[in-house]
Amino acid sequence: MTVEVGADENPDFAHDETDGAGDESDDEDAQGRDPELDLAVQYGDEIGDAQRKSLPKRKVIAEWLEPAIFSDTQFTVRFVGADEGRALNHSYRHKDYATNVLTFAYGEEPDGVTVADLVLCCPVVEKEAREQGKTLVAHYAHLLVHGALHAQGYDHERGEEDAAEMEALEIDILAKLGFPNPYR
């Protein structure tokens, strides 16, 4: 789910911590080099130390995102609890429930860098993984890839053709990462 947010509307958590820069992927951009991923990882107040330890680490998140980026990107991934997830979904989408992933796409910077925040609501992700019989790791990988594609303009809500294109990309990227088709 993508939320278009103008620069003056940045949520408080947007890009305040950078945890490294310049990870590389296997895809080359138009300039003949691999797209760069500048990645920050944050945790909401509801995420305790025990839960934080069970979440994917920055290096793993970067490994999952790299095949899903097609140009230089600056992403902040934020793991939140149900209250923050619900508040963000309500504020930006006018839906009064927490959802699995929200993508706050800020567009492309003048230098061509795609900037976005990917917010994952841990309790929702955990519940969905259990209900769908998926591993938690596979579900987090899928939702991060899904959010990254949204940040780059892919949108499954524009129609069946766009949904099919986005799903095919997700399936292909996840297969390259060693994960099963998330739609089965």
Curated annotation (Swiss-Prot):
Cofactor requirements of the protein: Zn(2+)
Top class in the EC scheme: hydrolase
One GO BP annotation of this record: rRNA processing
The keyword Hydrolase belongs to this UniProt entry's keyword annotation: yes
Entry note: cofactor: Binds 1 zinc ion.
Location of region: Disordered: 1-37
Gene Ontology cellular component annotations, sorted alphabetically: cytoplasm
The EC number(s) this enzyme carries: 3.1.-.-
Domain of life (superkingdom): Bacteria
Keywords linked to the UniProt accession: Cytoplasm, Endonuclease, Hydrolase, Metal-binding, Nuclease, Ribosome biogenesis, rRNA processing, Zinc
Classification via Pfam families: YbeY (PF02130)
UniProt xrefs under InterPro entries: MetalPrtase_cat_dom_sf_prd (IPR023091), YbeY (IPR002036), YbeY_CS (IPR020549)
Family matches, as PANTHER family: ENDORIBONUCLEASE YBEY, CHLOROPLASTIC (PTHR46986:SF1)
Functional summary from the UniProt entry: Single strand-specific metallo-endoribonuclease involved in late-stage 70S ribosome quality control and in maturation of the 3' terminus of the 16S rRNA.
NCBIfam families hit by this protein: PRK13963.1, rRNA maturation RNase YbeY
Similarity-based family: Belongs to the endoribonuclease YbeY family.
Protein name (record): Endoribonuclease YbeY
Biological source species: Burkholderia mallei (strain ATCC 23344)
